[in-house]
Amino acid sequence: FNEKIQWMKLNDHEFKYHIFADKIAVKKYISKKLNSNILIRTYGVYNSYDDINFDELPDSFVLKCSHDSGSVVICEDKRQLNHEKTKKKLNRALKRNQYLQGREWAYKGIRPKIICEELLRDEDGELPKDYKVYCFNGNPKYIAVFYNRFHRGGAEHVEGVYDTEWTKQEFSFDWNWGIADFTENRPEKLEEMLKYARCLSRGMMQSRIDFYLVNNRVYFGEITLYTVGGFSGTVPDDMDEKLGKMIRTQTYE
């Protein structure tokens, strides 16, 4: 699996991948390709932290950069936001070249900006679970449900993996993510998420399409083209070979 991801970085280059990796451009693509109703509300796009007028923002929101991974800042109460710490994190992220770090081709040339979005909450007022649909050759195969992704309250970040019939699988896409010891109820909007994932992954050897489900409404999260940058520690080990065989590269070789 990892070797195939590395191969994709070096050989599978289509212009639309730049759009998918750009958190601003992909929203425009989704709006035209699918349905703007599945997009998380955007409050603003900024060239720098100093450009943000926090008086115009709601009490809660999410800040992140448009060109990278891992720069997310969750603000639940802007009166409590540590501006010094947040500015330092985002300024560091704005200078980061995601392409040079891991040679993930899709990130090459994306202009870095800061995007501010609505903070989604589930019916219990908590951050919603992530539904990550892993697609192979344009077909959804597995759905990983992420819990406690941001380790709130020190909780462990765990993952539950299911097939498209919602049968629980006993593996994880990365050893850094614990395997959930419980079974998640089949989401009512599963077929809708799979439909969107099938449409967005068409023509790609492997991709991951992320969604949130809030108040029984599907929201698009992001498209990931290189799972864990091609350095995932799949558990158990034999799943790495099985997943790798699911990626067909013959068309390009």
Where would I find each of the regions flagged by the language model?
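Active-site rim elements
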Residues: 12-18, 181-186, 198
